[in-house]
C-alpha cells in the first residue's frame, strides 16, 4: 500500500472512530447501513416535516388492521437525520396505532442510545414526521375518506 492509500485508510478509520464515539455502536451501524430508507409506493400515509435546522424528513406508513405494517423514511438532511428517521420507522413497524402515538423524540433517542447534544433535535424531527403521518392517516379515516377501520 502506498503512502496516499495509507493516509486515506487512516483518515477513514479516524472518521469512523469519531462517529462511533458520537453516535454509539447502534447509531454508527445505522449511519453506515441505513434501514427503512426510501419511499413506500403503496403507503397509506406520508408526511414531510422540516426542522429549524433546514433538514426535512419524510415518513411513509403502510397500515393494516390497525397496525403499522411497514414504514420508511427519506431525508435531505445530515447523517443524524438519517439515523433518526431510520429508528423512527423501525420503532413504528408492528405497533398498533395507539402505541405509535407514544413515540416521541426521547423514544427515538433512547432507541439509538446517544447523539451529540447539537444533533438531538433530529430525533424530535423524526418523531414529528412520524406523528404527522399518523395524524394525516387518522384524519382521513375519521372523515370517511380512508379505510373502513384504522
What positions do the PLM features span?
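A short catalytic or substrate-binding loop motif that flags glycine-/basic-rich loops and adjacent residues
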Residues: 40, 50-54
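Alpha-helical support elements that line or immediately flank enzyme active sites
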Residues: 80-98
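C-terminal binding/interaction regions
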Residues: 1-41, 46, 64, 95-150
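Short, thiol/selenol-centered motifs that function as redox-active sites or metal-ligating centers
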Residues: 75-83, 122
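Immediate flanking context of iron-sulfur cluster ligation sites
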Residues: 67-76, 113
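Short, solvent-exposed loop/turn elements at beta->coil junctions and helix N-caps
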Residues: 45-49, 74
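Short beta-strand elements
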Residues: 55-66
Amino acid at each position: 500500500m502506498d503512502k496516499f492509500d495509507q493516509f486515506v485508510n487512516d483518515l477513514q478509520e479516524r472518521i469512523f472512530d469519531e462517529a462511533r464515539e458520537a453516535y454509539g455502536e447502534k447509531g454508527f451501524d445505522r449511519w453506515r447501513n441505513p434501514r427503512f430508507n426510501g419511499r413506500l409506493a403503496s403507503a397509506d400515509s406520508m408526511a414531510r416535516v422540516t426542522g429549524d435546522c433546514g433538514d426535512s424528513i419524510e415518513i411513509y406508513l403502510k397500515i393494516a388492521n390497525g397496525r403499522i405494517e411497514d414504514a420508511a423514511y427519506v431525508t435531505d438532511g445530515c447523517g443524524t437525520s438519517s439515523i433518526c428517521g431510520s429508528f423512527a420507522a423501525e420503532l413504528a413497524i408492528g405497533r398498533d396505532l395507539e402505541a405509535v402515538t407514544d413515540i416521541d423524540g426521547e423514544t427515538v433517542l433512547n432507541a439509538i442510545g446517544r447523539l451529540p447534544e447539537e444533533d438531538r433535535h433530529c430525533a424530535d424531527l423524526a418523531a414529528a414526521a412520524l406523528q404527522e403521518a399518523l395524524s394525516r392517516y387518522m384524519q382521513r379515516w375519521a372523515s370517511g375518506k380512508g379505510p373502513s377501520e384504522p
